[in-house]
């Protein structure tokens, strides 16, 4: 019998499974909705879909480069234990290879792309969820490019808890590029240089520092000078080039870069779970939630 789009839509809403999985299940069960749900459950696909309301705030970052292209990605899981699972690591590598080869514009586009095995990225992740038993999400990625006279710097901290990918122009010294990536991982600057800081943000900080100085009872005639000094400290906290180099605090990052006749084109820093609010549950609630399932 012919399967209608409405049937597929209804099954997707009931199970959260992918469109092609739903269509296939309905075809195999002659359009019987209940049997199709059972079939999806038997295959572990509906089970995976039911995990969609959970918060995936663990996981790992990964960086891969190929010639003049590089990718950094973050994939989330629910527990740190799964993030160390070989199956999860294989998934990370497979996704990295796909993103590097196909350079989708964003996660939404990536999820709909076909992979070498014929499935979409979304279907591939769903099948991995069924095997691993936790919600897994491709949270974000960035593909960077460089030219032959530039260098990628890749650094993973704590096995991928933090990942940084940098591009240095004017040098092919990957060791220096990696050192800068390590610095970014440790210090977490927000900008490359102070000229990237908006006038609005600078003025806002200046206003706060001025009020701080006045509250301290400093004479007005020296407040302006104090504020500019403190503003320099502010820039050192947020701007990469102004920071003391983590491997040698006697040097500024800009001095390390200048010694190689290089400039920082860009950097991307991912920290697993940043910005995701992890649900806090007590043990009694956790037990009750398991009982209800």
UniProtKB/Swiss-Prot annotation:
**Entry-linked Pfam families:** EF_TS
The encoding gene: tsf
Listed GO CC annotations: cytoplasm
Q: Which UniProt keywords apply?
A: Cytoplasm, Elongation factor, Phosphoprotein, Protein biosynthesis
Q: Which organism is it from?
A: Bacillus subtilis (strain 168)
Q: Which residues carry this modification: Phosphoserine?
A: 149
Q: What does this protein do?
A: Associates with the EF-Tu.GDP complex and induces the exchange of GDP to GTP. It remains bound to the aminoacyl-tRNA.EF-Tu.GTP complex up to the GTP hydrolysis stage on the ribosome.
Entry's SUPFAM superfamilies?
Elongation factor Ts (EF-Ts), dimerisation domain, UBA-like
Map out region (Involved in Mg(2+) ion dislocation from EF-Tu) in residue numbers: 79-82
One GO BP: translational elongation
Q: What is this protein called?
A: Elongation factor Ts
Family the entry assigns: Belongs to the EF-Ts family.
Among Gene3D superfamilies, the record links this protein to: 1.10.286.20, DNA helicase RuvA subunit, C-terminal domain, Elongation factor Ts, dimerisation domain
Q: Which InterPro entries match?
A: EF-Ts_dimer_sf (IPR036402), Transl_elong_EFTs/EF1B (IPR001816), Transl_elong_EFTs/EF1B_dimer (IPR014039), Transl_elong_Ts_CS (IPR018101), UBA-like_sf (IPR009060)
The organism's place on the tree of life at top rank? Bacteria
Primary location: cytoplasm
Location relative to the cell: Cytoplasm
Coiled-coil positions:
none
Alphabetical list of CDD domains matching this protein? UBA_EF-Ts
One MF term in GO for this entry? Answer: translation elongation factor activity
């Amino acid at each position: 019998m012919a399967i209608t789009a409405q049937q597929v839509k209804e099954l997707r809403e009931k199970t959260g499974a992918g469109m092609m999985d739903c269509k296939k299940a309905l075809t195999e069960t002659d359009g019987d909705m209940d049997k199709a749900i059972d079939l999806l459950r038997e295959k572990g696909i509906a089970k995976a879909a039911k995990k969609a309301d959970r918060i995936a705030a663990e996981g790992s970052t990964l960086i891969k480069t190929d010639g003049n292209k590089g990718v950094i990605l973050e994939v989330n899981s629910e527990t740190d234990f799964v993030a160390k699972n070989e199956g999860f690591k294989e998934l990370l590598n497979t996704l990295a290879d796909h993103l590097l080869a196909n350079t989708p514009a964003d996660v939404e586009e990536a999820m709909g792309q076909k992979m070498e095995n014929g499935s979409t990225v979304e279907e591939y992740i769903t099948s991995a969820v069924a095997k691993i038993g936790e919600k897994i999400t491709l949270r974000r990625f960035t593909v960077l490019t460089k030219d032959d006279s530039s260098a990628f710097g890749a650094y993973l901290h704590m096995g991928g808890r933090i990942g940084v990918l940098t591009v240095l122009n004017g040098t092919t010294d990957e060791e220096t590029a990696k050192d800068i990536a390590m610095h970014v991982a440790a210090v977490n600057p927000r900008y490359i240089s102070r000229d990237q800081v908006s006038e609005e943000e600078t003025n806002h900080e200046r206003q706060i520092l001025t009020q701080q100085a006045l509250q301290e009872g400093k004479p007005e005639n020296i407040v302006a000078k104090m504020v500019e000094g403190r503003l320099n400290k502010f820039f050192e906290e947020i701007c990469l080039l102004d920071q003391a180099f983590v491997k040698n605090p006697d040097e500024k990052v800009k001095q390390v870069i200048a010694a190689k006749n290089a400039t920082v084109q860009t950097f991307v820093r991912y920290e697993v779970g940043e910005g995701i609010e992890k649900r806090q549950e007590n043990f009694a609630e956790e037990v009750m939630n398991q009982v209800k399932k």
